[in-house]
């Protein structure tokens, strides 16, 4: 099914887009917060559960977020102009991914596309512009959490810029996912994902959704507040109770239906401050996430958001 041109919109004239969800758990939100919507498929009962407040793209994995007012919701994630969510990846010369877990200052690097050029910006660095399309560059085999994937190398100028910025003693490179290249199949890591689901460089799903209420609740348990940006979601919602997003089976946003697949595990990356690129551990955030939200202390922790995949274009 072709999802091209499907828009998820926020900031309309009344600055509100209704989020609907299917499932009996939604009824527990309470009167005044939930109301029913007429839908074309009588077997699914949709009720209003919240509003979309932010759309975020992270074009470069571990890079700075880009806030947008509209985005195309495609099978492999959000798209805005030439930007695709998590379609650029920093790697070592032998193809292993480099993320904010090893290099927290990556969160300060912004990647944008203007006039057919790829633009990189970072603190105390000159802006770098190179051609976005470099079809003569090599296709590189690389790995995201031991899953094989490919990317088009973005060239030596980009490599030198990133290596200098990170003050790395080892050369790093940037690759760009193109549609004909080998993609990840999330079902190889999590069997709940559809077998035909494909993503570029996300940890798992093409869409990650969380609520502002969940972050507010979490902050009551910390000695220093964290922001939604530390969790790097694609879609942020409000007007719902904390952690109710974990109960939503199917949701409709505008003309798109999304299906929840699994909760999002969390690691030390959540302790990287997106404003400074410094690891801060307020009451050790990842340990706090574990006991109160059903997890166990291990390398990844039960998070406060959920992985979704695009199901269909409704109209």
Where are these regions (language model features)?
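Metal-cofactor-dependent catalytic cores
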Residues: 2-315
